[in-house]
């Protein structure tokens, strides 16, 4: 198995630097006006952390880059939880305003190389439209988009370079118990229920339905956040891509 690991605090890691180089090489070969990187993975897998590190490294190299998160495009509570769909499919189909995310952010930049998005979106903490999302990026820049279920078949072709992060279900739950208690005020019982009944089975459904590994350029094991490991295709198929 091919492994590359390094600490991710402080100076850019070897892995982040390699990813940035691969992204720039791909961008040069594509010759597009707008270049979109997708960072996909389970909840608590480190998507935001990696996306920020990539933006920082690309910016250091003189490339205008911004991060956009699908978490800023949550649907209202009654949409996420009030559907007639089973809970597994509620997360998959109803968690995010994918129409606005794709048609307002991803597609405009991918096709035109210009992004001017300024809209008040839902703040899921209060279930109110008070979260102003402003995203601006011009021609020649790189948009690093991150979020859950990012590489769905319906719009995966809009991503020019795709990264899939992997963590085990046990690691995901352990991180969620800490994060959701500290940041979202959830009890241990609530967190365990959400992940066992909604998020874990939903991601398994996503792996079966959309096979994100098929379109990911790289798969990274983030079980140890300070030592991420780049997996080769065989190892990725064995540990990260099976539902």
Predicted region positions:
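Phosphate-binding P-loop
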Residues: 27-34
């Amino acid at each position: 198995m091919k492994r590359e690991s390094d600490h991710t605090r402080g100076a850019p890691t070897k892995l982040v630097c390699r990813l940035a180089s691969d992204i720039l090489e791909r961008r040069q070969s594509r010759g597009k006006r707008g270049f979109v990187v997708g960072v996909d993975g389970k909840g608590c897998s480190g998507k935001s952390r990696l996306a920020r590190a990539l933006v920082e490294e690309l910016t250091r190299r003189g490339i205008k880059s911004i991060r956009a998160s699908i978490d800023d495009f949550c649907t209202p509570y009654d949409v996420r939880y009030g559907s007639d769909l089973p809970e597994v499919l509620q997360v998959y189909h109803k968690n995010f305003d994918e129409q606005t995310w794709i048609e307002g952010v991803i597609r405009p930049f991918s096709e035109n190389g210009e992004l001017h998005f300024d809209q008040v979106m839902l703040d899921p903490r209060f279930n109110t439209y008070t979260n102003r999302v402003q995203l601006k990026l011009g021609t020649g820049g790189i948009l690093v988009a991150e979020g859950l279920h990012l590489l769905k078949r319906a719009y995966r072709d809009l991503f020019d370079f795709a990264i899939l992060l992997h963590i085990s279900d046990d690691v995901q739950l352990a991180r969620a118990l800490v994060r959701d208690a500290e940041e979202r005020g959830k009890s241990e019982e609530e967190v365990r229920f959400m992940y066992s009944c909604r998020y874990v089975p939903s991601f398994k459904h996503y792996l079966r339905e959309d096979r994100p590994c098929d379109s990911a350029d790289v798969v990274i094991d983030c079980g140890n956040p300070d030592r991420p490991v780049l997996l080769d295709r065989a190892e990725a198929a064995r540990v990260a891509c099976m539902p």
